[in-house]
């Protein structure tokens, strides 16, 4: 009986590579790329707090869901409230060399019979060369994998061999790199560096599953004519595992006065995402809807909803002139 459960859990964890959702899935990562790349921490200069909630397969009670709370900033010796005054008084001075960003993330990802809850702390370092910023970041994390099974789901509840199914606790690490300028960015990140073996039941070989390393490549270009209220941002994200299973997102976003935006994304995994959002003072809001199509389970065509709320403090437009950095 334990072997039967091991086989079922293994299919849930590993089948389909990227699509197996060993990692949380987000649609609005373009608004908060810190979710997928630790090098993002502090790269734009402002302080950002972000809350995101995602419900997949609307109408199905056991559909996947993801919730995440993140924060990231640049470490400075002056508070964000005083930066504009410092910038105005010393704007002609050359920017210093050292840059440090920090961040944190708490998340829970429920994938039906499996759930993953964890947190991470991030350190990033940024340097400049000829108006190009080079960033590197590392996140140290801890997470818990848990099997959400009951007697009615998988087995005869009287079977004592299943009493050993228990959560597994594991440390892990992520790394990321980013190159960015005034109008472009490109980055690479890797997660599950430790490739932890998640164990269920008695912890034998038949109930152990090793997590795959996941890689994300992002790139985008921001275009806006001078004195124009409109801007555009095409971008891509390539996600793949060490087994070379992959999916590609092709994205396009349009802005109006930096206060309103809308976008569309095509995923080769079989989904089209529409999204829109707005900024109001220090706050921003975003919504995305995923519609599945093609050779995917019928249940996945019910669609997914994702809501994002965030707050940004500070002035990112003048980040290159900030002084008194660490």
Map each language-model feature to its residues:
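Sec/Tat signal peptide C-region and signal peptidase I cleavage site
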Residues: 16-20
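Subset of outer-membrane beta-barrel
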Residues: 21-326
């Amino acid at each position: 009986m334990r072997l039967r459960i091991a086989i079922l859990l293994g299919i849930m964890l590993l089948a389909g590579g990227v699509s197996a959702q060993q990692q949380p899935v987000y649609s609005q990562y373009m608004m908060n790329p810190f979710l997928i790349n630790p090098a993002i921490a502090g790269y734009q200069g402002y302080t950002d707090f972000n809350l995101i909630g995602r419900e997949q397969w609307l109408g199905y009670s056991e559909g996947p869901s993801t919730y995440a709370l993140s924060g990231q900033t640049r470490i400075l010796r002056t508070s964000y409230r005083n930066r504009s005054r410092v910038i105005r008084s010393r704007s002609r001075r050359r920017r210093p060399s050292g840059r440090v960003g920090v961040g944190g993330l708490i998340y829970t990802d429920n994938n039906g019979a499996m759930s993953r809850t964890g947190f991470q702390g991030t350190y990033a370092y940024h340097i400049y060369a000829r108006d190009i910023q080079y960033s590197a970041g590392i996140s140290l994390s801890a997470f818990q994998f848990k099997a959400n099974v009951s007697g009615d789901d998988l087995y005869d509840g009287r079977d004592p061999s299943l009493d050993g199914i228990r959560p597994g606790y594991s440390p892990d690490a992520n790394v990321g790199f980013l190159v960015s300028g005034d109008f472009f960015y490109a980055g690479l990140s890797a997660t599950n560096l430790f490739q932890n073996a998640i164990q269920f039941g008695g912890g034998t070989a038949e109930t152990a599953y090793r997590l795959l390393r996941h890689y994300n490549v992002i790139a985008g270009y921001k275009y806006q004519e001078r004195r124009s209220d409109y801007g555009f941002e095409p971008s891509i994200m390539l996600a793949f595992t060490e087994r070379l299973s992959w999916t590609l997102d092709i994205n396009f976003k349009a802005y109006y006065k930096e206060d309103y935006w809308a976008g569309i994304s095509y995923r080769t995994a079989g989904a089209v995402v529409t999204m829109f959002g707005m900024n109001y003072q220090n706050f921003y809001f975003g919504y995305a809807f995923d519609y599945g199509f093609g050779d995917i389970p019928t249940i996945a065509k019910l669609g997914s909803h994702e809501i994002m709320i965030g707050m940004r403090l500070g002035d990112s437009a003048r980040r290159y002139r900030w002084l008194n950095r660490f």
